[in-house]
Amino acid sequence: MNNTDTLEKIIRHQKTKDPAYPFREHLLMQLCIRTNKRMQDNISEFLGAYGINHSAYMVLTTLFAAENHCLSPSEISQKLQFTRTNITRITDFLEKAGYVKRTDSREDRRAKKISLTSEGMFFIQRLTLAQSMYLKEIWDYLTHDEQELFEVINKKLLAHFSDASS
């Protein structure tokens, strides 16, 4: 018996106790949670082989996409919806690794800018290439139509949760 069979058995038991119990909804929620956890663990393992975590990767890709590969900590924080404290911690780590550097802002002497170093540029390009192959490997398991449906459903659910929390 695999994990989903066990999960279904447990939830089905709840349904036998209460016929009105939302079996499918509970099962879907549990499947989403478990799939998300496995994906996060898988991505963490992949990025860990390169010596970084997902948050550091997101900061690097945000800087890579920025004009002149340079942003202020508050711009990064806003784009990624990370706290300023978290951005500082991540930047400290990336600076020690030699991937970013802090510089004084030309517009405001009190402000700092964070920019990719040449080593950081090379690293993110190499990592992006490896990740491209890795992502294809993960998602090739689903057909193109299944991938599109998965995207539509997830966007719809995310919009629902965003509306519900407003």
Regions found by a protein language model. Give the residues of each.
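Active-site phosphate/pyrophosphate-handling residues
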Residues: 27, 58, 148
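Short amphipathic alpha-helical segments with heptad-repeat character
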Residues: 29, 33, 37, 81, ...
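Charged, amphipathic alpha-helical coiled-coil/dimerization segments
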Residues: 92-149
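C-terminal regulatory/oligomerization modules of transcriptional regulators
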Residues: 1-20, 145-166
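N-terminal helix-turn-helix DNA-binding core of bacterial DNA-binding proteins
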Residues: 23, 41-82
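Short, hydrophobic-biased segments on the C-terminal half of alpha helices
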Residues: 73, 91-92
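N-terminal leader segment of winged-helix/HTH proteins
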Residues: 1-50
